[in-house]
Amino acid sequence: MNCKILFRKELNDSECELSLLLVGDSDMKEINRLRRGKDKTTDVLSFPLEFDFSPLQKILPKNTSSDQKMFPPIALGEIVISIDTLQKQAKEIGHSEKDEFYRLLVHGFLHLLGYDHERGDKEEHIMKLKEDECLEILQGL
């Protein structure tokens, strides 16, 4: 994903990976109940590995080619997306399921990096700007 351009500071130009799980509403409701205590479905959940990125900026080499990397990719965590809710929201919003998938993926990815719109208006604004930037890049692909 070319969104890496937007996250160089957080990732220090390092390779990263994440797990993506696509489920139906019933499975999403169960995951949401077990992990967050909310007995309802939702569109996307993120489960970061609680990794502190700040030491990476000190130890990882910058701008090295992939064959020169000394470290394995950083495992960021897992994103879970409900396909049922994705389809409903795409129809309600009036855009394609592909666009809604990208929107949810980017939203989940930002949560893995520590962005959180629930921490207040300022954080919500910052996260929304990052989402919009990344979605512009994805729409250009």
From Swiss-Prot:
EC number: 3.1.-.-
Top-level lineage group: Bacteria
Co-factor requirement: Zn(2+)
Co-factor remark: Binds 1 zinc ion.
GO molecular function: metalloendopeptidase activity; RNA endonuclease activity; zinc ion binding
InterPro entries: MetalPrtase_cat_dom_sf_prd (IPR023091), YbeY (IPR002036), YbeY_CS (IPR020549)
CC annotations in GO: cytoplasm
Record GO biological process: rRNA processing
NCBIfam families noted in UniProt: rRNA maturation RNase YbeY
Full protein name: Endoribonuclease YbeY
Species name: Leptospira interrogans serogroup Icterohaemorrhagiae serovar Lai (strain 56601)
